[in-house]
Amino acid sequence: IRRVLIILMLLSGWVKAQQNEEIKPNFIIILADDLGYGDLGFTGSTQIKTPHIDALADSGVIFTEAYVSAPVCAPSRAGLITGKNQVNFGYDNNLTTVLPQFNPEYSGLPVSEKTIANRLSELGYINGMIGKWHLGEKEQFYPTNRGFDEFWGYLGGGHNYFPSEYNGAKYDLSL
């Protein structure tokens, strides 16, 4: 009987420990530049097939009442990733090439601003960022220095898939 009681006590402690484990949800935030509301299958598009995004939407939560806090991409990203109105920390326009007269500290999302990835890391999440960053191209602004554990994408903003020509000058802003 003594052995049975000891085993039951140990098992009850293990069961209690299992019950106390917090289940953290996984989540994916999809931000696409210039995407119209009806451009995805689950929002009604019949022209653009998006079966994988539709499946995610089917099994997840969709936020349809969001507010885009800027009309251009980099400030919108800054607002989303910090949870703040980006104008409050001086991020009100798209980034361009850093000119010599500008302080490089201001050529990206201010390092003093915490990101959603920073906050999620504090809660034990592993964070990844895939795609267009456009929140600074210098090392201090890299996604992997802003709370993301992994990054696969490109740091800059707009680009062309093929080499382009502007006023007779050829340029190639590759990925």
Predicted regions and their residues:
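Formylglycine-dependent sulfatase
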Residues: 18-175
